[in-house]
């Protein structure tokens, strides 16, 4: 019995003692379970009565479960690796299929006899895309030629219409491959003299670099060599020539000077020194040629040229410039009368609405001899000749009422030395878009030459008759004799003293007209520059005087609202006539009277009239009595 128990104990101890490999597999289980198992395996409190192997069987199940978990984990890792490899393989296969499809679409790759590496295929595809750039609307050569015309007939028609010569030049060396017979009419060279020669030998030395630049930058075909990434050797392509295309990047248009084979004149040595005659004999004249055309590509075999012997020929197409050269004249045709056209001498000035200078261009100093600061703040009427003031005042009034440009007749402008220069001006007014008021007048003044004034032809009809003087315009409506004005010491002859007041009175008149039109109910939607409308109903004062705007007496006869007339209703409106025309009462006479009648009594009377007008305008008084005025009405 004791022996039997010893055998059972040894069997259990052998069963409970794990193998080192089993210890490694059981390490995947928790540490608590390992400790439990060790304590259970080392303890001697086993209940062997009736259940001698139950605890050992539980431990075996745990070990088997750990082994199964380890096997499953190893299987999952292996399956994940296999799945990743399959994904990478499918990706590589898909990329290879796309590269093969791309190689079949690129002509340079499709023409290769051997399989290219991926990098070379991608490089050729990029260069092919660069070639197609800009050729969104390609046209073949057949689309440019009508069916009923042959090639020779079309060539002759083009040369006749272009009045030039056709030439074909290779882009690599500048060799003239073809030139039409019409080159003899322009360069005096025959067709045989130029074919096969270098174009650079017939160009001006300073134009060679420019022509080389036009020939080298080709966009019609790839000009750089393709290198295999594996071997490092240049790739030779055998491209089947297709229909040539014209794209916008291949267009060329440039000017260059070419030698003209003009017949030389024999120079005798006795007339000129030997060195001078030799230089003149060797000197060749050049003519300017305007070349327009396209860069095109042909295979060397199609051109009929022996290009196989050239060392740098790598099977690429021959890129050429096909252009038409036309003679560009050196001298612009002059008028029949031999007059040389030059840029007109002019300067720009800016004036306030009363004609005072607010800006003067710096070019005015070279024309008028005035510095800009000498003209600023002065009125332009102070420099006008007295015979031209009437016409210029008319233009001044028009430019304040319209937005159009006003061109004056030729007039005389006083320069710094006291003499006069003839000018013609273009005036236009600038209106503030917010306030709708004229802010300033811009004048472009052009100097008129003396021969234009002397001609007086149909181009300048206003020059045939001299403009009316200021006095004649003012006296025409009154029928009185022309007054003689005294000469003011210190003022050069030809100008009028106090002429600067004319511009101020014109500006005040236009402002008064705008004020009246702005207060009129019928002019609410009209422009402030439009001063013509239908007169409103009659408004009269109790004393029989004409009242304006419900209380303002009619003072147009006194010259304060000149340029207006009255109808039967008594409302003043403009007749669109000049402020200095026949119906006007503002002029040099009034200016001279104002200068000669400056006294305290006159000033007090004028102030009393102004106060009465203000009271009547505000409705504070009755009609104004003008009998106390020192001047007649």
Swiss-Prot record:
Component of the circadian clock oscillator which includes the CRY1/2 proteins, CLOCK or NPAS2, BMAL1 or BMAL2, CSNK1D and/or CSNK1E, TIMELESS and the PER1/2/3 proteins. Forms a heterodimer with CLOCK. The CLOCK-BMAL1 heterodimer is required for E-box-dependent transactivation, for CLOCK nuclear translocation and degradation, and, for phosphorylation of both CLOCK and BMAL1. Interacts with PER1, PER2, CRY1 and CRY2 and this interaction requires a translocation to the nucleus. Interaction of the CLOCK-BMAL1 heterodimer with PER or CRY inhibits transcription activation. A motif (Nuclear localization signal) lies at residues 36-41. It holds the Pfam family PAS_11. This is Basic helix-loop-helix ARNT-like protein 1. Residues 150-222, 333-403 form the PAS domain. The modification Phosphoserine is found at residues 17, 85, 97. Residues 518-528 have a biased composition (Low complexity). SUPFAM superfamilies: HLH, helix-loop-helix DNA-binding domain, PYP-like sensor domain (PAS domain). A motif (Nuclear export signal 2) lies at residues 368-376. The record marks 84, 87-88, 92 as: Interaction with E-box DNA. GO terms for cellular component: cytoplasm; PML body; transcription regulator complex. Residues 408-451 form the PAC domain. Transcriptional activator which forms a core component of the circadian clock. The circadian clock, an internal time-keeping system, regulates various physiological processes through the generation of approximately 24 hour circadian rhythms in gene expression, which are translated into rhythms in metabolism and behavior. It is derived from the Latin roots 'circa' (about) and 'diem' (day) and acts as an important regulator of a wide array of physiological functions including metabolism, sleep, body temperature, blood pressure, endocrine, immune, cardiovascular, and renal function. It comes from Tyto alba (Barn owl). One of its GO terms (molecular function) is DNA-binding transcription factor activity. One of its GO terms (biological process) is positive regulation of protein acetylation. It comes from the Eukaryota. The keyword Transcription regulation applies. Residues 79-132 form the bHLH domain. Keywords: Acetylation, Activator, Biological rhythms, Cytoplasm, DNA-binding, Isopeptide bond, Nucleus, Phosphoprotein, Repeat, Transcription, Transcription regulation, Ubl conjugation. There is a cross-link at residue 266 (Glycyl lysine isopeptide (Lys-Gly) (interchain with G-Cter in SUMO)).
